Design a protein with these regions (language model features):
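C-terminal transmembrane helical bundles of large multi-pass transporters
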Residues: 804-806, 829-922, 926-931, 939-945, ...
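Juxtamembrane segments of multi-pass membrane proteins
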Residues: 465-472, 477-488, 493-720
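Interfacial "coupling" helices/loops that link adjacent transmembrane helices in transporter permeases
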Residues: 12, 40, 314-356, 422, ...
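Short cytosolic juxtamembrane segments of multi-pass membrane proteins
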Residues: 420-438, 940, 976-991
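Alpha-helical transmembrane segments, especially those used as permease/efflux helices
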Residues: 14-19, 25-32, 36, 260-274, ...
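Membrane transport/envelope proteins' first extracytoplasmic loop
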Residues: 2-313, 322, 376-384, 394-397, ...
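Alpha-helical membrane-protein architecture signal
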Residues: 2, 342-346, 350, 437, ...
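Small-residue-rich transmembrane alpha-helices
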Residues: 273, 317-320, 329, 353-385, ...
Length: 991
């Protein structure tokens, strides 16, 4: 049997190689799921912890404990208490199983003084703390003198080191011997000498996570073991405090068992509290939050793999079916010559087993390599020079690879079972019989899949609309796997519908042009038209699935990345925005007591009321000194620059407005009987107003050169609005929310804020979006703020000048760092500085987005590789099985060139049509199902709105892959056809 097996595999070595490559890719894909998932989760945790460290300047991996000793215990009891304390902490830390970066112990006596040495006031004695810290010599650098020597010197002196700040605090000097004693018992004393002054070797060292100067201000350090041993034995030094800290190497943490780790940390807090041990772990809250975030990322990554896993299963089934169809005649011969079904199945089972063993060995490591490459993904099929993912081989990866092999084995054996029932006579008879319709055609599976997926999509969208109308956020959408299954089912349904009708279309074409078709064209049309249940349909369905999923993945990734980039560009409004301090006498005097920015001072001015003091009123009419604006035009990389003034809580009022009043429960409670009987005259002249308005004033001509904006967000191009504002300076562009207040185009409204006199403007347009202005910005009353855009020069004449923002457009390819450096060189001290490019980088570094980009890229690569391999397998088998047909055609007089053209026509009619149909189906699927992904990022209120806009570059990448696939196929097929012994085929044809 083994001889027969290896002979069979040798004769079909190229087929076996294609199968092996396909199975390795399938296995690698499956094994990447746990590898990439764990690596993505770990990177997400590391980024969260790094952000925590940057924000709070605390090492997040710190595991800190402390213990206060009793004052009335002997030296031996102190030593025993410290030892017991250290043992408890060490045992508890080991329970967590976290990677250890360092282990530090510290003891101290805070009640020591220097005899016969008074501090500078001359009345009190010099007090200090003696401390001992393990491994301190490895983490400090000596600035003056030398490092202490452990133990007691021959002259009875203990050597110490101290920081310069500690020496100033204690007024001790270097290289001076001091006699020290306990403040509570000065009968005994010991001698110390500070032999060196040190500083921290590395400021970012986790060893000093708690801070050196802040925690050890008046500490003189000696050797830890010497202090705990010899010094305590003298009776002079008494340990009052013990500290045992660990630093966790969070970059190497294992994410697989985080839930149990969080549970143990909670239990340890209770344990340490019961044992009077202080405990803190800054990362504990992050780890809790991470547990929920990781579950969301884990779920999203899993769901993204659903279409790919379904594609792998379909690929394995297709390859197995083609393999069995190719060898069905051989199986029938075995059966007729007396081989049992078990023997025949055993041969194929052994072949699958050999390939399976190789796959289990190779697959996980191939998956590991893929994950390393994907770690540098900055977008869909975009890679940057970023540190690779912390990937490592896991048992889970091998298990997943084994599962893939098991599925492959079962899938391979399923088509063999019915084939072993057929004898050679029955096989020949079946080839002559008319093929029946497949089961899926009889049950109309294509209509069921398309109808079911579209029906679910309709129901889902209606449910979402209802929830949004009720103000409810659908949290279940983030964990709804049906959106992924439905998209794949939609593609599969349309693919099945295509192969249902395609043979009839081909037959119609063959009949219409039967008098004009060349022999090669007619034979191609006839072959495909008659293959109503043949493998051509299977190939078309396979290509539709792979290419459509590729388009779907590309559009999904592009929509997610575009949404991230556009939200940053819209929020900033341009390439960079800068604000700086504007000087005035009022601000300068205020800065002497409490420093505050100009924007804060201006904002405080807007909150004044008529009931406040005159001094407070003057703040609203403060005169600012405008800096020289031309400085900004000379900065490095700047192409254009403009002034943009922004103000919140501006009041817009009009006689025609009817603004719903936000009435609260307290308003009703404050009303009295007199309020309801009040007949006082309304001095507001019937005007209704809203104070929840964001105001932006711009210089239209300059603003058009600087701002970034998507034209699809407005009914007409942005410049049309800017032209209107430039031509009619007392105009205003309002947010569409003002329409609900009753305003119309041409209405006049009154604008006011702070101590400025009100002025009138005319409504020129209503818009939903404007660069830098979010329609979802929350107001103080809990609603959304309206916005208004006016002409800067007009408003500046009507009101007193206030600090404005400076908006920049940078030249193409300009360095942001050089731009920052030029700001420093120009002496500009910005209060705020926003860069769209930097915020985009931060947005793209979001672990969720990175994980999805990696998963989509991985899925696309795997699908395209399977597409190429499946394509090659089909055409290799097709050409090899048609040797007799080629001989017959040659015997009938068809030239070799015409046979080649016949194959080309078949490629176009089968592969070409399937690919073009797949691109169309993928586009339709993207338009219908990609918008559902906004629920993953809670993008219902994102600005701009989540949109699916195909990118030409993504399709070019797809076309490049397809082009390589077709080119490779033509090269391989050309070589195969050349190797066919036409003379033998010709004889077969003549016979």
């Amino acid at each position: 049997m083994f001889t027969l097996l290896f002979r069979k595999m040798r004769n079909t070595k190229w087929m076996v190689l294609c199968l092996l490559i396909g199975f390795v890719m399938a296995s690698a894909m499956m094994s990447t799921i746990p590898i990439y998932m764990n690596a993505s989760l770990q990177r997400m945790l590391v980024k969260d912890l790094e952000s925590f460290q940057t924000e709070y300047e605390i090492y997040p991996g710190a595991y800190n404990t402390s213990y206060g000793l009793k004052m009335d215990i002997s030296g031996s009891e102190q030593q025993k208490a410290v030892e017991n304390y250290n043992n408890k902490v060490e045992a508890k830390f080991k329970e967590l199983g976290l990677p250890e970066k360092l282990d530090k112990k510290y003891i101290s006596d805070e009640y020591l003084y220097v005899r016969s040495l008074a501090v500078s006031d001359g009345n009190s004695q010099a007090r200090f703390t003696l401390g001992g810290m393990t491994d301190i010599s490895d983490h400090i650098s000596i600035k003056q003198g030398r490092m202490f020597t452990a133990g007691k010197r021959s002259d009875g002196v203990y050597e110490c080191v101290a920081t310069e700040k500690a020496m100033k605090s204690t007024e001790l000097a270097i290289n001076t011997v001091y006699e020290i004693a306990d403040v509570f018992d000065d009968n005994k004393s010991i001698k110390i000498e500070i032999v060196g002054v040190f500083d921290v070797k590395d400021e970012n060292d986790a060893y000093w996570a708690e801070g050196l100067d802040s925690q050890y201000t008046a500490v003189v350090f000696t050797d830890y073991d010497t202090m705990l041993g010899d010094c305590v034995d003298t009776g002079v030094v008494n340990i009052t405090k013990a500290v045992h800290n660990y630093a966790v190497d969070y970059a190497s943490m294992n994410m697989t068992d985080l839930a149990s780790t969080n549970e143990m940390i909670a239990k340890q807090k209770t344990y340490f509290g019961d044992n009077s041990i202080g405990f803190s772990m800054p990362a504990s809250d992050i780890l809790k939050d991470y547990e929920s975030r990781s579950s969301q990322l884990q779920l999203v990554l899993w769901l993204l793999q659903i279409p790919v896993i379904l594609m792998i299963i379909f690929y394995l089934f297709m390859v197995s079916q083609l393999n069995v169809e190719q060898e069905r005649n051989e199986i029938a011969v075995f059966k007729s010559r007396g081989a049992s079904r078990l023997q025949i199945m055993g041969i194929y089972a052994l072949e699958s087993l050999v390939l399976g063993v190789l796959t289990v060995i190779i697959g996980p490591f191939a998956g590991l390599g893929l994950c390393k490459v994907l770690g540098a993904s900055n977008g869909f099929l975009e890679f940057v020079n970023r540190r690779s993912l912390p990937v490592h081989m896991t048992i889970e990866a091998v298990v997943y690879a084994a599962i893939a092999v098991a599925v492959f084995f079962v899938t391979t054996m399923i088509p063999i079972v019915p084939a072993t029932k057929t004898t050679i006579v029955e096989h020949k008879q079946s080839k002559a019989k008319k093929k029946k319709h497949a089961l899926w055609e009889k049950v109309c599976l294509d209509f069921i899949l398309v109808g079911g997926s579209v029906g679910w999509l309709y129901y889902y969208n209606k449910t979402q609309e209802k929830l949004v109308a009720e103000g409810v956020t659908d949290t279940t959408a983030t964990v709804n796997p049906i959106m992924f299954v439905a998209s794949t089912a939609f593609i599969l349904g349309l693919g099945l519908f295509l192969i249902r009708i395609y043979p009839y279309i081909i037959r119609l074409l063959a009949r219409i042009g039967r008098r004009v078709w060349s022999p090669a064209q007619y034979v191609s049309l006839t072959n495909i038209g008659r293959s109503s249940t043949g493998r051509e349909r299977f190939l078309m369905l396979f290509l539709v699935l792979t290419v459509s999923l590729g388009v779907f993945f590309a559009n999904t990734a592009r929509a997610l990345n575009r949404n991230a980039e556009e939200s940053v560009a819209y929020g900033v409004g341009c390439d960079a925005v800068l604000t700086e301090q504007w000087y005035s006498s009022k601000i300068e005097s205020a800065q002497q007591t409490t420093p505050q920015s100009a924007s804060q001072a201006a904002q405080s001015g807007t909150k004044q009321t008529s009931e406040e003091s005159d001094e407070e009123d003057t703040e609203t009419t403060i005169q600012y000194v405008e800096p020289v604006f031309e400085r900004f035009e000379k900065l490095a990389g700047v192409e254009n620059v403009t002034k943009v003034f922004r103000k919140d809580d501006v009041t817009i009022s009009s006689n025609k407005m009817n603004v719903p009043r936000q009435q609260t429960k307290s308003d009703d409670e404050e009303k009295t009987r007199d309020d309801f009987l009040d007949q006082s005259v309304d001095t507001s002249s019937g005007k209704s107003s809203t104070s929840n308005v964001q105001l932006m004033t711009i210089v239209p001509s300059d603003f058009s050169k600087v701002c970034k904006f998507e034209d699809r967000l407005l009914p007409v191009q942005l410049n049309n609005y800017l032209n209107a504002l430039a031509e009619y300076t007392p105009g205003v562009i309002l947010s569409s929310s003002f329409k609900s207040y009753g305003l119309e185009l041409g209405d006049t409204v009154e604008c006011k804020w702070g101590g400025n006199e009100p002025f009138e403007v005319t409504v020129l347009a209503f818009v939903d979006y404007w660069p830098g202005l979010s329609p979802y910005k929350e107001a103080k009353n809990g609603g959304y703020m309206d916005f208004a855009v006016m002409n800067y020069d007009y408003v500046n004449v009507q009101t007193s000048m206030e600090p404005y923002e400076v908006w920049f457009k940078l030249k193409d390819g300009a360095s942001v760092q050089e731009f920052y450096d030029s700001i420093d060189k120009a002496g500009i001290k910005p209060l705020t500085l926003e860069s769209a490019s930097q915020q985009t980088i931060e947005k793209k570094n979001d672990p969720m987005l990175q994980g999805m980009n990696g998963a989509l890229t991985l899925g696309f690569i795997i699908i395209m590789v399977m597409c190429i391999i499946g394509f090659l397998i089909y055409w290799i088998l097709s050409i090899k099985s048609r040797t007799l047909q080629f001989g017959i055609l040659r015997a009938m007089g068809m030239k070799f060139r015409e046979i080649i053209m016949m194959i080309v026509y078949e490629q176009l009619l089968v592969s070409g049509v399937a690919i073009f149909a797949a691109i169309f189906i993928g586009g339709v699927t993207s338009a219908l199902f990609v918008p559902l992904f906004q629920s993953i990022f809670d993008a219902s209120q994102s600005v701009p709105p989540f949109a699916v806009i195909p990118e030409r570059s993504d399709y070019l990448k797809l076309y490049a892959v397809i082009g390589v696939m077709l080119l490779t196929a033509f090269v391989v097929l050309g070589r195969l056809i050349k190797k066919i012994k036409i003379s033998q085929a010709l004889k077969l044809g003549e016979d």
